[in-house]
């Protein structure tokens, strides 16, 4: 959409995401970093396979992969600033299919997360160094794919401070100040961040929690159910956010137009 010029001359952008932790009729706001910069990775470690009865005649990729996965966890516990949230999760590993055969290769992969885009770039570099280093120590070769073609890297979602004040004011007018809550930072990612790289933006959480209706499960759960009362609230919020912003900034918009 950005490439095709959909943003046009927009000065600001607002987005919403449903939140089952917040009651229907409420919104939750966070200024600054709110959603993580994210990427995926897949690693292949090649050794020399052979019979498990003679491991000395093989180059065991399972051992190299095991040490790599353990060493990767130290990037978070020993290298990451604890005040700058980061996550490294290995989510799959595969290699071999027989009880008595050491395979010739092992594959594993997962995801990296950081509340700063710069932090993710550093984490990516260290991941490559650790996997290649551990593979070399165990006489193996490592190949790492950051999956950028199939799963593009996402920047962090960083909410604009000025727009935070605007959303807080509009939310208070529309829903009442008691229904505008402080939100939580989450290590999930959102492509809304690409818009924020171009213009100031703000993503808020809109509550859908309603225990009577069973609207309590997270969006990716098979038991997810939407409290549809939120549809009218969301539409009204989107309208009010845009209309009041345009009214407050009409001079700058008109100046650019003429």
List PLM regions with ranges.
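Histidine/acidic-residue-rich, glycine-tolerant segments that coordinate divalent metal ions
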Residues: 1-103, 190
């Amino acid at each position: 959409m950005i490439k095709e010029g959909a943003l046009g001359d927009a000065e600001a952008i607002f987005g919403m995401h449903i939140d089952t932790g917040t009651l229907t009729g409420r919104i939750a706001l966070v200024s600054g970093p709110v959603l993580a910069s994210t990427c995926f990775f897949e690693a292949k470690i090649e050794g020399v396979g052979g019979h498990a009865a003679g491991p000395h005649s093989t180059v065991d990729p399972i051992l190299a992969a095991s040490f790599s996965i353990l060493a990767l966890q130290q990037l978070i516990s020993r290298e990451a600033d604890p005040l700058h949230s980061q996550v490294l999760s290995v989510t799959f590993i595969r290699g071999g299919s027989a009880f008595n055969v050491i395979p010739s290769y092992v594959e594993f992969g997962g995801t990296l997360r950081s509340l700063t885009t710069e932090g993710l770039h550093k984490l990516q570099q260290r991941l490559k160094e650790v996997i290649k280093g551990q593979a070399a120590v165990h006489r193996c070769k490592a190949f790492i794919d950051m999956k950028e073609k199939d799963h593009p890297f996402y920047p962090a979602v960083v909410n604009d401070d000025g727009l935070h004040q605007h959303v807080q004011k509009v939310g208070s007018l529309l829903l009442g100040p008691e229904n505008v809550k402080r939100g939580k930072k989450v290590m999930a990612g959102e492509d809304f961040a690409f818009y924020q790289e171009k213009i100031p933006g703000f993503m808020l959480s809109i509550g859908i929690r309603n225990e009577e209706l069973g609207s309590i499960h997270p969006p990716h759960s098979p038991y997810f159910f939407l409290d549809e009362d939120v549809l009218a609230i969301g539409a009204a919020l989107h309208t009010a956010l845009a209309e009041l912003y345009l009214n407050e900034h009409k001079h700058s918009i008109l100046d650019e137009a003429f």
